[in-house]
Each structure stands twice: as structure tokens, then as C-alpha cells.
């Protein structure tokens, strides 16, 4: 190779930026994939809206095992329970999307959303197919408050839970306002008294116009 060819090769390679290798080879945490692969396990992600957010569907009996894995694995231990809620899918058809094919006819479906600081990813788990789910408060302290709101609004119950009193409604209240069968219009309503700091379940009076 001549001197001019060597100089030209060095000049051309000097302007090329070397691509950085991705910090994590797999997009979805492989520890979770191998752990739940024998279950009815499915996950989705969107590279258009938010590429670091995954949605997973698991049977309800996997809730306690899920928390133990999230708290014990090296790259999953640095995680935070961001949100916990529920959805009443009673009467929901499969035409709403592929995700609901796994969730339909399950009544109330729980949803737990975690953020993993080391992986920089957010994963939302839907737990379906059961009325009772093991509590996550032994692994995440804020699960105590969030699960109490779910059980109060959606008539759910958590196993191994230390505190199950109502937060938003009066103690001893047996109605669940967020269920689809709750008569939200026409017959009854929940009224909050700001002076007495109490809530009341009262019958609505029909008015003719």
C-alpha cells in the first residue's frame, strides 16, 4: 500500500463515529421471561409511544412469586411500585384489542406497574383469573395503601395483608362504587359531607321536569 493510500485510509476512518454497544442486550428482562415462560404469559410493547414500557399478562396466582422475583434478582431489585389499580372488564368483548382476549370474562383485573432503575424500564403486569391475590406489601411498602383502595373500590381481597380497613369510605361500608354493577345513576349515590367528614350511601329522589 502506498503512502497516499495509507493517509487516505486514516483520514476517512477518522471521521467515522464508533457505535456504542447497548448497555442491555435484551429489551425485556430475561429473568422474568424464563421464570414465567411455563405460565400463560404474554407481553407487549410499543416502539412508537414509549419503547421502554412493557405490558404483561399473568394469572393471579403468580402475584406473590412476581414480587419475590422483583425483589431478589440483581437487575430487578432496584425497582419501585409506581401504580396499582384495577379494571372491571365484565361484559368486555374481544373486539377491543388482542390484549383483552386474555382478560375478558375475568371480572376485575388487577394492574401493578413497576419502574426498574437499573434497566430504565417500566413494566405493567395484569393479573387475571382469580378473586384473591397475595399482597405485595411485604416487598413494597406503598402497596399497603394502594391495595386497600383497590379492595375498597372493586371488592377485591388480598391474602397475607396486615391492614384492610377502608380509606375513602366509612368503616363497615359494603358497597363498591367502581364496579360496573354499582348503580351510579338513577337509584343511589355516594355523598360526602365536608362538615362531618363522612360519606353516606343515599337513595336518589326522582324529579319530574
UniProtKB/Swiss-Prot annotation:
Cited function: Core subunit of the mitochondrial membrane respiratory chain NADH dehydrogenase (Complex I) that is believed to belong to the minimal assembly required for catalysis. Complex I functions in the transfer of electrons from NADH to the respiratory chain. The immediate electron acceptor for the enzyme is believed to be ubiquinone.
User: In which compartments does the protein localize?
Assistant: Mitochondrion inner membrane
Q: What is this protein called?
A: NADH-ubiquinone oxidoreductase subunit 9
Substrates-to-products reaction catalysed: a ubiquinone + NADH + 5 H(+)(in) = a ubiquinol + NAD(+) + 4 H(+)(out)
Q: By its UniProt entry, which InterPro entries does this protein fall under? A: NADH_quin_OxRdtase_su_C/D-like (IPR037232), NADH_UbQ_OxRdtase_30kDa_su (IPR001268), NADH_UbQ_OxRdtase_CS (IPR020396)
Q: Oligomeric state and partners?
A: Complex I is composed of about 30 different subunits.
| EC number assigned by the record | 7.1.1.2
Any one GO cellular component localisation term in the record: mitochondrial inner membrane
Describe the family membership recorded for this protein in Swiss-Prot or TrEMBL.
Belongs to the complex I 30 kDa subunit family.
From the UniProt record, which GO molecular function terms apply? NADH dehydrogenase (ubiquinone) activity
Keyword presence, Membrane: yes
Main enzyme class: translocase
Which keywords describe this protein according to UniProt? Electron transport, Membrane, Mitochondrion, Mitochondrion inner membrane, NAD, Oxidoreductase, Respiratory chain, Translocase, Transport, Ubiquinone
Amino acid at each position: 500500500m502506498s503512502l497516499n493510500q495509507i493517509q487516505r485510509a486514516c483520514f476517512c476512518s477518522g471521521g467515522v463515529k464508533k457505535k456504542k454497544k447497548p448497555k442491555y442486550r435484551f429489551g425485556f428482562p430475561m429473568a422474568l421471561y424464563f421464570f414465567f415462560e411455563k405460565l400463560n404469559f404474554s407481553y407487549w410493547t410499543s416502539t412508537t409511544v414509549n419503547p421502554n414500557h412493557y405490558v404483561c399478562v399473568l394469572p393471579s396466582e403468580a402475584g406473590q412469586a412476581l414480587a419475590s422475583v422483583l425483589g431478589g434478582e440483581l437487575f430487578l431489585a432496584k425497582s419501585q411500585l409506581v401504580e396499582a389499580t384495577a379494571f372491571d372488564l365484565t361484559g368486555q368483548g374481544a373486539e377491543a384489542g388482542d390484549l383483552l382476549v386474555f382478560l375478558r370474562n375475568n371480572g376485575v383485573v388487577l394492574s401493578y406497574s413497576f419502574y426498574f432503575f437499573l434497566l430504565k424500564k417500566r413494566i405493567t403486569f395484569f393479573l387475571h383469573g382469580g378473586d384473591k391475590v397475595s399482597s405485595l406489601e411485604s416487598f413494597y411498602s406503598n402497596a399497603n395503601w394502594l391495595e386497600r383502595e383497590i379492595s375498597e373500590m372493586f371488592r377485591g381481597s388480598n391474602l397475607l395483608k396486615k391492614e384492610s380497613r377502608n380509606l375513602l369510605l366509612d368503616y363497615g361500608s359494603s358497597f363498591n362504587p367502581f364496579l360496573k354493577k354499582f348503580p351510579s345513576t338513577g337509584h343511589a349515590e355516594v355523598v360526602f359531607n365536608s362538615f362531618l367528614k363522612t360519606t353516606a350511601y343515599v337513595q336518589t329522589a326522582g324529579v319530574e321536569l
